[in-house]
């Protein structure tokens, strides 16, 4: 029997895995944005390898869920529910990061038009917000200061507002000045997938916040 026979046990044992996924996810998101802004195909290619590796590791955790549940005692059904929900959020996060990484790589690989200055500026603002949220989440998990989660989750609505505003701006741009369908598609894809990444990350945090 592992220590993980209670929800508290799962929280303690999973902290390292979560901090690891957050650290690498933060880097992968930044690398996708920077590679796209600088049209750096090599960097985007390397980033693609990183997310494949991370996805495989999260999949491996999911593949071991059978043994995790078998290992629990009868009083610990809550722990398995918690663990399965956490795995779901981790998978959602890696799926969003995979999509962001792949579309960024594909856009540059296929020599499509570079994103416009304003688009890069707007994405830079989002990247900064995501980096800040991830940094605070990493600190929280590394130090097990789960009482700080509430204030991190509050950042979600601020980032949502930025995403919404950028979507509206791009709609306006597309109607008046944008000449590249590929650019428009890429830009909307990045915004929407960032929203999904944000939902998965804050969902994960909320789960810990509730249980802790």
Which positions does each model-derived feature cover?
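Cytosolic, long alpha-helical scaffolding segments
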Residues: 1-212
């Amino acid at each position: 029997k592992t220590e993980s026979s209670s929800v508290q046990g799962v929280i303690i044992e999973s902290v390292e895995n979560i901090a690891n996924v957050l650290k690498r996810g933060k880097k992968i998101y930044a690398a996708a944005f920077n590679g796209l802004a600088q049209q750096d195909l090599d960097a985007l290619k390397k980033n693609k390898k990183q997310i494949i590796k991370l996805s495989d590791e999260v999949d491996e955790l999911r593949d071991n869920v059978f043994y995790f549940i078998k290992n629990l005692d009868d009083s610990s059904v809550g722990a398995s529910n918690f663990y399965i929900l956490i795995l779901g959020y981790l998978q959602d996060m890696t799926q969003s990061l995979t999509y962001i990484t792949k579309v960024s790589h594909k856009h540059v690989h296929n020599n499509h038009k570079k994103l416009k200055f304003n688009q890069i500026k707007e994405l830079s603002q989002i990247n900064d917000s995501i980096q800040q949220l991830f940094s605070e989440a990493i600190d929280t998990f590394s130090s097990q200061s789960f009482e700080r989660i509430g204030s991190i989750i509050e950042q979600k609505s601020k980032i949502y507002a930025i995403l919404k505003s950028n979507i509206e701006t791009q709609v306006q741009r597309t109607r008046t000045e944008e000449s590249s369908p590929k650019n428009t598609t890429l830009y909307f894809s990045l915004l929407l997938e960032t929203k999904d990444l944000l939902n998965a990350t804050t969902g994960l945090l909320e789960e810990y916040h509730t249980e802790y």
